[in-house]
Every structure is written in C-alpha cells, then in structure tokens.
C-alpha cells in the first residue's frame, strides 16, 4: 500500500450511521464505528490548522450522542473520529473507547510521517532525474516539470522496497490492535446483553 492509499473517500458529505442498518464504511471507519457514527463535512480552514503530530480536534454538536467522523487530516489523509462518551459509560466501555483513541493516534502518527517522507523523497527523485536530463524544475511555459509514468514507476518500486519492513511491522501491529478492539467490542456487547437480561428479570420480579 502506498502512503496516499490512506486517503478517505466521500469528502464533504454527512452520513448518519446507526446500529442495525447495513451501511458501507471504509476500513478505518469500520474499525472505529460503534453504536452510532456521523460524518462531519470537510472544513478547509480546520485542515490547514491541523498539527502533523496529532489527530484533528474538530468539535461535534454538544447534544450529539454518536461518534463523529471528521474531515480528512491534512497530513495523514485519515478522517479522525471523535468518540462519544455516554454518562453511564461502564469501565469495560471506557477501556474499549480509550483503546480506539490510542489506536487512532498511533495510526495518525504513522501515516502523517509516512506521507511526509513519501512527498519529500518523491520531489527529490523528480529533481534528480530532471537534473540528469539537463532540465529545469519549470517548463518553457512556466509549468512545473514532471516525469512520465514509467520513470515514476522506478521511484514507487524503490520506495516500497525500502519501506517494506516498516510496512510489514505496521500491518502486524494494525492487525493486533484491531483484534484487541474486536475482542473488547464482543465483551462490551455481552455486557450490554447481560444488563438487559437483569433489567427484565427485575421488572418481572416487581
């Protein structure tokens, strides 16, 4: 996967996701979505102010009782998730939410750094090839000089080869984290079912 593949689709739209309805979500959103999730519209000024070392801190409506997916981050191209915290959040639900938040921060940091490295090395590669050809950074018409697809394929191949081990470790950790999240989601689901059963028993006894 190239760094740019971490981008999000469907920018500028607002979607309400609720449990019990079949709705398509990108892999990242599926990993973080829970009882409810809403997609915030993209805001240009907000993206410009995003820091490369953290997740964008957009603010959903105060009365919202769902998770919100924000606009794509300027550096990682990932949509940050603002997790809803219910008043009666159980210790197990809190542990799941914090695990999701920590995983999101980790994922954000990796792709922000990786995309920055990708862009920097890409520009250096283009400049080097143009210099070898005796060409400048601008064409005669003043446009930015570029390389053809075959020449850029050499860069992509070299970049992927050089970062193979880094991507391998990332994928390994990504699967571990998602397995842990899925495990705790199962525990939370069982906890909620058990609580509902206890409430029904209390009503019957009364």
Swiss-Prot record:
Expressed in fibroblasts. It holds the Pfam family COA8. Its main location: mitochondrion. Residues 1-39 form a transit peptide. It is a peripheral membrane protein. GO terms for biological process: intrinsic apoptotic signaling pathway; mitochondrial cytochrome c oxidase assembly; protein stabilization; response to reactive oxygen species. Induction: In conditions of increased oxidative stress, the protein is stabilized, increasing its mature intramitochondrial form and thereby protecting COX from oxidatively induced degradation. It comes from the Eukaryota. InterPro entries: COA8. Keywords: Apoptosis, Disease variant, Membrane, Mitochondrion, Mitochondrion inner membrane, Primary mitochondrial disease, Transit peptide, Ubl conjugation. The keyword Transit peptide applies. Belongs to the COA8 family. It is linked to Mitochondrial complex IV deficiency, nuclear type 17: An autosomal recessive mitochondrial disorder with highly variable clinical manifestations and severity. Clinical features vary from acute neurometabolic decompensation in late infancy to subtle neurological signs presenting in adolescence. Encephalopathic episodes are characterized by acute loss of developmental milestones including ability to walk or sit, loss of speech, episodes with somnolence and seizure, and pyramidal signs rapidly evolving into spastic tetraparesis. Required for cytochrome c complex (COX) IV assembly and function Protects COX assembly from oxidation-induced degradation, COX being the terminal component of the mitochondrial respiratory chain. This is Cytochrome c oxidase assembly factor 8.
């Amino acid at each position: 996967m190239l760094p740019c593949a971490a981008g999000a689709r469907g920018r500028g739209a607002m979607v309400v996701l609720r449990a019990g309805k079949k709705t398509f979500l990108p892999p990242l959103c599926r990993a973080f979505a829970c009882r409810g999730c809403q997609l915030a519209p993209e805001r240009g000024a907000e993206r410009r102010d995003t820091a490369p070392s953290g997740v964008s801190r957009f603010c959903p409506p105060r009365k919202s009782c769902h998770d919100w997916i924000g606009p794509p981050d300027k550096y990682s191209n990932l949509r940050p998730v603002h997790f809803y915290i219910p008043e009666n959040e159980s210790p197990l639900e809190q542990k799941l939410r914090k695990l999701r938040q920590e995983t999101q921060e980790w994922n954000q940091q990796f792709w922000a750094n990786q995309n920055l490295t990708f862009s920097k090395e890409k520009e250096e590669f283009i400049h080097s090839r143009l210099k070898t050809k005796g060409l400048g950074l601008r064409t005669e018409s003043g446009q930015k000089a570029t390389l053809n697809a075959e020449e850029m394929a050499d860069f992509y191949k070299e970049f992927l080869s050089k970062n193979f081990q880094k991507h391998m470790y990332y994928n390994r950790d990504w699967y571990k984290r998602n397995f842990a999240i899925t495990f705790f989601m199962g525990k939370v689901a069982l906890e909620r079912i058990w609580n509902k059963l206890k409430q029904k028993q209390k009503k019957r006894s009364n």
